[in-house]
């Protein structure tokens, strides 16, 4: 048994446990609680680095029903990176006391990934979570999750980077996610990807495309790339929550 929590700052180190369910031997890693993968804090950096460098087989995002919009910021960022994603909407019992409910099937349809409602304290929903997790793990392939659409200039810059990234056939990281990290010039993360030989940033075709993408973005006279990404994700999260959450 591990004592963990799903609020930001609760877990300060990774807690690891194992269990067997539905024919799967699972190793579960509880990452530091965070609302973002932007690596502005130690918790965010640990969570982000684990997801992109350790490449888990699946990622379960545990959300609080009472602040779903804020939690969806993290979910949408994570879905750009991970290939197998499940979303757990927790504390349904507490939400019910406050008059809060979530249309779980609608949220699942919007995100394109399994969504499970839970009240972890009473273990309500735990069996469904394990069953759907194992189904994902045993499937040869799963549909890719929803992609956040950014502004047209940013999307054009991404399109310039995708062919040379895909030509490298990077293992364990998604080409679109790598392109976005290059566009926001996340030097520390890009160095880690290079050190792990997950992406060859010095490849001539990639360098040429990167320069073209930079020039395109510089000519648009828009806010910094990271700010544009965050704004799009926050807007998408808010609109999703407004669509599926009912509250007094």
Model-predicted segments: where are they?
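Extended helical scaffolds that flank P-loop GTPase cores
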Residues: 112, 139-248
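Conserved G1/Walker A P-loop phosphate-binding module
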Residues: 1-42, 52-54, 58, 80
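Active-site glycine-centered loops adjacent to acidic/histidine catalytic or metal-binding residues
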Residues: 30, 90, 119
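Short, surface-exposed acidic/glycine-rich loop or hinge patches that mediate macromolecular interfaces
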Residues: 34, 65-68, 120-123
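Canonical P-loop GTPase G-domain recognition
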Residues: 93-149
């Amino acid at each position: 048994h591990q004592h963990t929590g799903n609020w930001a700052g609760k877990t300060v180190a990774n807690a690891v446990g194992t269990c067997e369910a539905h024919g799967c031997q699972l190793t579960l890693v509880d990452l530091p609680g965070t609302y973002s993968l932007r690596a502005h804090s130690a918790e965010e950096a640990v969570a982000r680095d684990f997801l992109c460098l350790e490449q888990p087989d699946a990622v379960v995002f545990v959300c609080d029903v009472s602040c779903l919009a804020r939690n969806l910021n993290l979910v949408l960022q994570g879905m750009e990176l991970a290939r197998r994603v499940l979303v757990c909407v927790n504390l349904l019992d507490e939400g019910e006391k406050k008059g809060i409910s979530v249309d779980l099937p609608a949220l699942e349809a919007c995100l394109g990934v399994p969504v499970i409602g839970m009240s972890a304290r009473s273990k309500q929903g735990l069996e469904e979570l394990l069953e759907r997790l194992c189904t994902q793990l045993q499937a040869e392939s799963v549909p890719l999750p929803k992609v956040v659409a950014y502004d047209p200039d940013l999307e054009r810059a991404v399109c310039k980077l995708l062919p040379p990234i895909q030509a490298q056939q990077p293992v364990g990281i998604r080409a679109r996610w790598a392109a976005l990290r290059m566009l926001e010039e996340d030097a520390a993360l890009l160095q880690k990807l290079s050190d792990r030989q997950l992406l060859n940033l010095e490849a001539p075709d990639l360098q040429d495309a990167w320069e073209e993408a930079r020039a395109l973005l510089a000519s648009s006279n828009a806010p910094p790339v990271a700010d544009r990404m965050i704004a799009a994700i926050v807007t998408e999260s808010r609109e999703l929550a407004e669509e599926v959450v009912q509250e007094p």
